[in-house]
């Protein structure tokens, strides 16, 4: 269920395989093995570096994954996963620590934490969960590794070897993406694996259990079902059992078992919390109770194993809708149209409001806006004020050529949810598409307030296009440079900014603003150049920033 990278990959190793190596290099083994083998939640390592350095490493990883189209860069999805993550982080032992959450386009059931509090959740994991509490349990576990300083303890002896190893492996990704010599990525990767063999670092069994314990407490404090973590472990045991005709354990995770003791301990701790706090609980569903609404993944042996229902959430909850949204955005839209159409026709119980929304989204992305409108109209009657549904309707109307109705709906949504990135981005793009200078100015005005706290390249690209059509070429070029930086092309961003300084039409304030941005990016870009980590087509470092 993965989309091809935007840039052609000429290396023998695909970026996703190399990214898997990065995740594997940073993953922590789960201690003694017993009879229950489940995918480990894939915690990653941090080194003994400053918090700011850690954030830079984590941000560089995210930017490079974006450059290779490995991230679900969608404002609604970003808002949801970050709202969920920060709701948990706020109730953790370190509520003021830096965290950032994002979704990876990968059908593997996995999640990992990277330096600087960056936590990634694979699309495959989101799809396989049955409730928001189960998804929250995965994230809470990763937060637990960070808040309990497992990252620092695990690397106390190896100092900075592991994060540098991660950067070396990211360099292999870059080599594969940029078309550098065919054997270059393999050489980098082989060398990295050798270093890892010498500096093998794992989470201890105690660390894993402690992350579970802290995660369960965080779940309860944040108002989620503390039983969800153990329930998810058991669910994975069911669906990853080859003997049961389920999903094969992903190769990346085969060596990361979850012990029976760990499952039992999670159950016991959750039970104690429920008794003490009288929290709501949600019981796991047996297989014959599940609805077949999970998209097929590449490691499925029997499609009947992929059956799940949003337990404890109504069928039009944000969780249920975003899960379908992730399924569609992480895959090929025409393929998803066929999946939904076939399942709606042949699978009893598949037809739910959330799956109808997913079908409509896939139709719109496939250029069938009129059909998408037909799917969405009954849903709007169920929840007429649902922002996710209404935004989907606006997108469908725009695609179907109903521009007036689409713009009116975008405007109403923006008035009701000002500064919502998903609404503003869609509305701005629709305005710019009109080609009118006044509407382009309106689009730029919509997006400008979001630039102060946004790192989504789509926001900057859209603002750049709007500013360009509005006649403000300086702001447009600044925005395009920032879009390049956040897309994993830092050298390109620096070159754009330097070229801007040569313009004769810059006023004092514009020149000062551009120079300040160059000064801000220079140390970051120099560090990436030093490590040869960049997705720019710059294998020889010819665009080294002025020092």
Residue ranges and their predicted role:
Residues 33, 41-48, 59, 71, ...:
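Extracytoplasmic and endomembrane cell-envelope/extracellular-matrix remodeling and assembly machinery
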Residues 77, 97, 155-166, 184-187, ...:
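Acidic/histidine metal-binding catalytic segments
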Residues 121, 137-145, 149, 211:
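Active-site recognition of the HExxH zinc-binding catalytic motif
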